[in-house]
């Protein structure tokens, strides 16, 4: 991977015809990862639970170029069958319930997917001798509300609320399969992903962009002071592939965790202002101050990934936002009523 290039490169010889299982392929990162794997000529298998027509992997036509297995990440028999029948070499585990609000309302289903799904996949991989690399997508939320910033990989995993706890547990389960059984696992912990293809309008970036395109003031559910680092989705997809390549060449990486981040701290209000500025609008956000059970301040130290993997993100926040905004402009232009030159008007999207 060329860390200074705008578009990360991959080892085509490594990926060509390689059987790769992607869980969570209909999600934001999963869709872009599948696109990158197809470009690298991998033989991609996607485990899909729900049929979501608006998912980027489906809208782009990429789903027609992969092997699709309808199944649930919590179905261990299904997982073992997929790993065996397709002779999977590399596993990219992205399947998860990722919405904090849903986790607070329905913790059991979140625990089943994020914790149960992880150990069932790890156990299926343990019983599948052809699996050579497993990349498990954890999250910065796995650290909980740690007081020492930035978070390093040595920061204890101490989630407090349902979503955070589910990521802490899944992370530790992946590590224990590496440490106890020698399973070839690495864990990634990323900041808040963003990019084209995210149609969850309750998220801060897509919700704000949609509001501006509709001529509406974006709504911030919190007081705007929450601080995060934001990680562009194409950087994430490239980093997962780069990590798998490194694991193949360096077995000593098994069991390691890596923070992936731009290491730039941005408050919600600063982020919204950056989007408004980039879109050239005079609209102002409506700040509701309603959000609860969310961590006030998080950002990651990615020096381990830089030093161990020779990795760094290709997209600055400005560059990523520019690319993302253009994607949404194209999306709404393609999906507006052809008999109406204006975009549909609705309520302003509430953002985190």
Predicted segments, located by residue:
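N-terminal Rossmann-like NAD(P) cofactor-binding module of classical short-chain dehydrogenase/reductase
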Residues: 89-92, 135
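Conserved NAD(P)H cofactor-binding loop of Rossmann-fold oxidoreductase domains
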Residues: 95-98, 138
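Catalytic helix-loop patch of NAD(P)-dependent Rossmann-fold dehydrogenases
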Residues: 105-120, 127, 133, 142-187, ...
């Amino acid at each position: 991977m060329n860390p200074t290039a705008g578009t990360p490169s991959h080892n085509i010889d490594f990926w060509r015809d390689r059987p790769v299982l992607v869980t969570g392929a209909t999600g934001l990162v999963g869709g872009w990862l599948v696109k990158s794997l197809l470009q690298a000529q991998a033989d991609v298998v996607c485990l899909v639970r729900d049929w979501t027509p608006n998912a980027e992997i489906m809208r782009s036509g990429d789903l027609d170029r992969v092997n699709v297995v309808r199944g649930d990440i919590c179905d261990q028999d299904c997982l073992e069958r997929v790993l065996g029948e397709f002779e999977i070499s590399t596993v990219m585990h992205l399947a998860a319930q990722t919405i904090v609000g849903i986790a607070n309302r329905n913790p059991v289903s979140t625990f089943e997917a994020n914790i149960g799904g992880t150990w069932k996949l790890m156990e299926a991989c343990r019983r599948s001798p052809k699996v050579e690399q497993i990349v498990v997508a954890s999250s910065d939320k796995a650290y909980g509300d740690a007081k020492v910033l930035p978070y390093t990989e040595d920061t204890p995993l101490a989630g407090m609320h349902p979503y955070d706890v589910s990521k802490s547990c899944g992370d530790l389960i992946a590590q224990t399969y590496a440490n106890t059984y020698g399973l070839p696992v690495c864990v990634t912990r990323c900041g808040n992903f963003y990019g084209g293809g995210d149609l969850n309008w309750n998220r801060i970036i897509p919700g704000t962009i949609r509001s501006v395109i509709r001529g509406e003031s974006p709504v911030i559910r919190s007081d705007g002071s929450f601080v995060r680092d934001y990680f562009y989705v194409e950087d994430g997809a490239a980093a997962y592939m780069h990590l798998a390549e490194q694991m193949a060449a360096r077995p000593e990486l098994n069991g390691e965790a890596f923070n992936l981040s731009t290491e730039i701290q941005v408050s919600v209000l600063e982020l919204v202002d950056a989007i408004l500025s980039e879109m050239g609008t005079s609209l102002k956000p409506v700040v509701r101050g309603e959000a609860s059970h969310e961590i006030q301040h998080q950002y990651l130290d990615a020096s381990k990934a830089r030093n161990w993997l020779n990795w760094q993100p290709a997209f600055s926040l400005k560059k990523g936002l520019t690319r993302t905004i253009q994607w949404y402009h194209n999306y709404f232009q393609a999906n507006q009523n052809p008999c109406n030159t204006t975009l549909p008007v609705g309520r302003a999207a509430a953002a985190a």
